[in-house]
C-alpha cells in the first residue's frame, strides 16, 4: 500500500529514467540472469519514462526473478522488493532481496542409447559427464548434455537419430528432479561418391589427400581434416568440402569438393632480435610445378649473424599431406659467438614421413664447408653427412608448418671415408613444453642436450659444434658466448723475434646442456609478465661448471606483431673474468 501511494504521488509526472537497482542474496551467473530478465534493467537507460510505466515494470519483478532462478534449480524463491520515488537527482531506487530457497536436486538420471549404434564408442565422449544424482538441477547442463548426444549422432553419421524420450520432471514437494533421455540411433550412414571440382593436379593425386574412403562410416571430422589437408597442400587459394543430402535408401552421404587454384606466391617478414640484429625473410613459392603436385620454393634469410639462400623441390609421396621426398640446395654463412664463423654449401636429398605422433626425416648432406677460427684460421671440409631426425607432431597433424616442437632429436655423423677430417657422431635433443597452470598462469619448460664423439673438436666443422647463450638459450649472456676456451698458437714478432703468447678463443664444445624454467602471467591488453631461470653451458665434458641467470620479462602479443622484452642477470659465469652485468634481450617479430 505504501509503495502504491508513493507511486501515485508521481503518477502524472515524467521522470528521468535513471533507475538504480540493488540486488541482494544472489551473485555470479544467477545475478546476471536476474538482471537479464528484469524489465526495469532494460528500461533504465531510457531518456524519459512515465511513473505509471515504472509501476508496470516494478509489478513484474516477482515473476521475472522467479523465472531467472528456475534454470538454476531454485523454484521457490522468496522475493522482497521496494521502490523509492525520484530523489533530488531524480533517480528511482529499486531494492530487490532474494532468498533462493531450497534447491531442486537430481534424483533419477536415466540415459539410454538404443538402436544399431548403441555400442558404438563414438558416443563415449558425450556420455563421459552426464548430470549426476545429488547435483543441483541446472537447465543449461541438461540442455548441453542432451545437445552433446545429438551432436555426436550427427557428427558420426547417425543422421536419422532421434530422442524418443526427453523428459525433465520436477517435484516441488520433495525438491527432486528426474531426467529421462532415450536416443534411438538408427543406421549409421557411410561416405558415398566424392565429386571433385579442381584443375590444379590430376584427379587421382588430389584424391590421395582425402581423409576417408568411399564406403567408410561417415565422420564429419574427416571432412574437416580433408579441408585442412587440401588447404595445407598450397595448391589452392580456396577449398570447400561439402556434404550433400543423405540418401535414406542407401544410407550414404555424397561429398563435393570445390577448389580454386593458387597462384605463385611471395611472402616477406622482418624483425629484430638482440641475437640477430635486424632480420628479414623473403620467400617465393611455386605451389604446383606440374600436374603431379610437385612444389618449388626459394627462400632468402638475412641477419647480422646468418645469411641463408635455400632452394627446395618437394615431391609428395605416400600420404601426400604428411610424406615427401625433397631435394634441397642451400648456401649459408653463420657467425658463432665472436670467434668462429662458417660458410656452407650443401645439397641434401631427404625423405620425410609421419608415423603417428612422430615425424621422421632421413637425409644425406653433401657439404662443402669453410670454418674460420683463431686456432686453425681457415679449414675446408668436403664431406658427406647422413642424418636422421625424429620430431613430435601434434594430434591430427596434416603437414602444416610448425614453429616449435615439444621434442626434436637429431643424430648425424660422418667418417674419414666420407670426407671428414676425423670420424664423428653428434646427437642433439631439444624439448619444450607449456603447462597451463590456470587460465592466466603458464609454466614454460625448455631444455636442450647435446653430445659429440670426436677426438679433437677443432676437426669438426664449425656448424656442428655446440655453443650456448642468447635469447633462446641462456639469457644474461650474449649470443653463443658460452663455450670452451682454447688458446691460439704462440707466434714470434717478425721484426724483433719476440714471442707473442696465444690468446683465448671460444671455438665451441663437444657437449651441451641448457634448461629454462619460466612462469608467465597473462595481463590485460594482450600483455604478459614473466620471471625465469636459465642454466647450462657448452663444454668438452659434462662435469664442467654451469652458468646460471635469472630475469624478468614482458610480452606483447598482437595479431600483427609479437614483442618480447627480457632483462636477465647472470648469477654464475664460468670462464668469464668477472660476472656480466644485466643484459637486455629484445625480440620483435612482425607477421607480414
Give short role names for the model-derived ranges.
Residues 116-122, 219-408, 435, 475-476, ...:
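Gram-negative/organellar outer-membrane beta-barrel architecture
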Residues 96, 181, 537-541, 571-573:
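Short, solvent-exposed loop/turn segments at secondary-structure junctions
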Residues 12-14:
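N-terminal signal peptide c-region/cleavage motif recognized by signal peptidases
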Residues 17-29, 35, 42-277, 283, ...:
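Periplasmic polypeptide-binding modules associated with outer-membrane biogenesis and secretion
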Residues 2-10:
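Bacterial N-terminal signal peptides
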Residues 232, 251, 372, 379, ...:
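C-terminal outer-membrane beta-barrel translocator/porin domains of Gram-negative envelope proteins
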Residues 543-552, 556-558, 562:
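Strand-loop-strand
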Amino acid at each position: 500500500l505504501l509503495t502504491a501511494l508513493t507511486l501515485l504521488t508521481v503518477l502524472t509526472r515524467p521522470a528521468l529514467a535513471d533507475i538504480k537497482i540493488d540486488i541482494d542474496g544472489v551473485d555470479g551467473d544467477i545475478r546476471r540472469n536476474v538482471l537479464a530478465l528484469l524489465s526495469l534493467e532494460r528500461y533504465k537507460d531510457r531518456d524519459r519514462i512515465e511513473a505509471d510505466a515504472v509501476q508496470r515494470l516494478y509489478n513484474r519483478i516477482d515473476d521475472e526473478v522467479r523465472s531467472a532462478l528456475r534454470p538454476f534449480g531454485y523454484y521457490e524463491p522468496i522475493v522482497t522488493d521496494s521502490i523509492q520515488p525520484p530523489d533530488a537527482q531524480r533517480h528511482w531506487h529499486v531494492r530487490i532481496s532474494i532468498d533462493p530457497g531450497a534447491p531442486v536436486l537430481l534424483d533419477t538420471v536415466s540415459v539410454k542409447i538404443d538402436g544399431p549404434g548403441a555400442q558404438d564408442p563414438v558416443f563415449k565422449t558425450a556420455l563421459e559427464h552426464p548430470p549426476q544424482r545429488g547435483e543441483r538441477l541446472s537447465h543449461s547442463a541438461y540442455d548441453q548434455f542432451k545437445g552433446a548426444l545429438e551432436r555426436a549422432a550427427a557428427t558420426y553419421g547417425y543422421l536419422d537419430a532421434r530422442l524418443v524420450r526427453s523428459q525433465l520432471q520436477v517435484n516441488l514437494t520433495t525438491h527432486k528432479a528426474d531426467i529421462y533421455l532415450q536416443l534411438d540411433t538408427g543406421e549409421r550412414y557411410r561416405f558415398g561418391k566424392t565429386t571433385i571440382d579442381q584443375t590444379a593436379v590430376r584427379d587421382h593425386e588430389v584424391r590421395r589427400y582425402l581423409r576417408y574412403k568411399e564406403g567408410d562410416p561417415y565422420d564429419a571430422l574427416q571432412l574437416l581434416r580433408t579441408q585442412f589437408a587440401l588447404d595445407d597442400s598450397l595448391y589452392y587459394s580456396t577449398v570447400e568440402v561439402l556434404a550433400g543430402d543423405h540418401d535414406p535408401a542407401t544410407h550414404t552421404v555424397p561429398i563435393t569438393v570445390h577448389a580454386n587454384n593458387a597462384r605463385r606466391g611471395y611472402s616477406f617478414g622482418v624483425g629484430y632480435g638482440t641475437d640477430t640484429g635486424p632480420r628479414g625473410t623473403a620467400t617465393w613459392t611455386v605451389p604446383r610445378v606440374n600436374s603431379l603436385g610437385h612444389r618449388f620454393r626459394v627462400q632468402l634469410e638475412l641477419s647480422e649473424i646468418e645469411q641463408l639462400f635455400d632452394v627446395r623441390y618437394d615431391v609428395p609421396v605416400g600420404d601426400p599431406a604428411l610424406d615427401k621426398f625433397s631435394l634441397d640446395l642451400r648456401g649459408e654463412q653463420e657467425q658463432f659467438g665472436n670467434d668462429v664463423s662458417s660458410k656452407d654449401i650443401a645439397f641434401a636429398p631427404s625423405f620425410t614421413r609421419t608415423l603417428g605422433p612422430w615425424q621422421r626425416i632421413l637425409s644425406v648432406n653433401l657439404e662443402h664447408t669453410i670454418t674460420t677460427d683463431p686456432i686453425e684460421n681457415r679449414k675446408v671440409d668436403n664431406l658427406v653427412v647422413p642424418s636422421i631426425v625424429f620430431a613430435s607432431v601434434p594430434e591430427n597433424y596434416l603437414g602444416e608448418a610448425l614453429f616449435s616442437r615439444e621434442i626434436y632429436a637429431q643424430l648425424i655423423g660422418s667418417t674419414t671415408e666420407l670426407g671428414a677430417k676425423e670420424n664423428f657422431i653428434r646427437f642433439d635433443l631439444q624439448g619444450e613444453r607449456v603447462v597451463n597452470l590456470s587460465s592466466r598462469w603458464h609454466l614454460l619448460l625448455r631444455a636442450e642436450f647435446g653430445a659429440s664423439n670426436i677426438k679433437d673438436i677443432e676437426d669438426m666443422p664449425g656448424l656442428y659444434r655446440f655453443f650456448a647463450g642468447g635469447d633462446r638459450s641462456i639469457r644474461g649472456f650474449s649470443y653463443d658466448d658460452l663455450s670452451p676456451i682454447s688458446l691460439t698458437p704462440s707466434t714470434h714478432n717478425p721484426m724483433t723475434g719476440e714471442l707473442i703468447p696465444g690468446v683465448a678463443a671460444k671455438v665451441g664444445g663437444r657437449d651441451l646442456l641448457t634448461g629454462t624454467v619460466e612462469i608467465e602471467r597473462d595481463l590485460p591488453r594482450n600483455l604478459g609478465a614473466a620471471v625465469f631461470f636459465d642454466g647450462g653451458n657448452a663444454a668438452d665434458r659434462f662435469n664442467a661448471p654451469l652458468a646460471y641467470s635469472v630475469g624478468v620479462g614482458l610480452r606483447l602479443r598482437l595479431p600483427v606483431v609479437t614483442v618480447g622484452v627480457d632483462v636477465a642477470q647472470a648469477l654464475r659465469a664460468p670462464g668469464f673474468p668477472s660476472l656480466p652485468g644485466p643484459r637486455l634481450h629484445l625480440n620483435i617479430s612482425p607477421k607480414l
